Amino acid sequence: MAAVTVEEIRKAQRADGPAAVLAIGTATPANYVTQADYPDYYFRITKSEHMTELKEKFKRMCDKSMIRKRYMYLTEDILKENPNMCAYMAPSLDARQDIVVVEVPKLGKEAAVKAIKEWGQPKSKITHLIFCTTSGVDMPGCDYQLTKLLGLRPSVKRFMMYQQGCFAGGTVLRLAKDLAENNRGARVLVVCSEITAVTFRGPADTHLDSLVGQALFGDGAAAVIVGADPNESIERPLYQLVSAAQTILPDSDGAIDGHLREVGLTFHLLKDVPGLISKNIEKSLKEAFGPIGISDWNSIFWIAHPGGPAILDQVEAKLGLKEEKLRATRQVLSEYGNMSSACVLFILDEMRKKCAEEGRATTGEGLDWGVLFGFGPGLTVETVVLRSVPINA
């Protein structure tokens, strides 16, 4: 019998078709705060009510945030038990770590269970796990903890992504696409879980970018199942992952930084982040959609990481986008705040549900092609080209 060639083995290993998102699940902590009440609560719990001018500034930030509510694991009771977390820069990493190494995998599990249920296959068919968080670091990591919590096979192939920040919702889809398309039969469980216990701290008039984070960030976890060549009798593709790219924007050093210190994760950003993104976004779009022959940005559906309202406003203006293009993005920002890596997966979920409710022809607001954008530290941009699927076809 002739020996099998490496080329033949390679061909047999690969999937035939493109990777697709097969299911989505999301979860939040039970506790939430309303943005209208948050400035009073925040300055009270951090014992900063004497900083009246700063409080007024923070109120204006919250008013402009376009956020209605945010979910937060940190309750008033937890914060009262951990006064160092409420101070501006007090050593508190141990207390923060003790919370997130337990709660980040737990919240991830809630989202994963929902995604697995929608997928409809036994969890033993999950071949790969990608876990992503910017909330805490530990060994073995959240990927290991989630494997145990869900009862996945010990041979599941795990990837753990720590400290990537807000662009990572795009990164995990890019990685999942490569895994699914290069390993025939692979089913990749992707989980992004974020808890603001690492970044919460009291106010300081010398560090206003920290206050911006306190006004925007919320907690949430999202999970997706990604696979190629779906079993159409059970699996229902939601979005095909057509291409994925990552780039560092020019002249953006130091635009968004986070540093893990004894005081927790500190957050720093330049004022011109919205300008840097809006100035460079069309280049990423042209590179992604040129091969497909698309140059009208209103002819595609949009899943954009909602870093904050200023980013969305400037992107909209720069590209001449119609108001409804960022509806799903703004809806998630309003109801959850900025949940870092989990946001774009929440927006995918919001869009496919709304499309089904409204009787749209496809999961992409009736359109065929779409883009998913992640923006974050670097300044790094992830661009994922999506193709929607017909609803009830």
UniProtKB/Swiss-Prot annotation:
Catalytic activity: (E)-4-coumaroyl-CoA + 3 malonyl-CoA + 3 H(+) = 2',4,4',6'-tetrahydroxychalcone + 3 CO2 + 4 CoA
Active site positions: 166
Domain of life: Eukaryota
First-tier enzyme category under EC: transferase
Disulfide bonding pattern of the chain: none
InterPro entries assigned to the protein according to its UniProt record, in alphabetical order: Chalcone/stilbene_synt_C, Chalcone/stilbene_synt_N, Chalcone/stilbene_synthase_AS, Polyketide_synthase_type-III, Thiolase-like
GO aspect biological process, one term: polyketide biosynthetic process
Protein name (record): Chalcone synthase 2
Taxonomic path: Eukaryota, Viridiplantae, Streptophyta, Embryophyta, Tracheophyta
Gene that this polypeptide is encoded by: CHS2
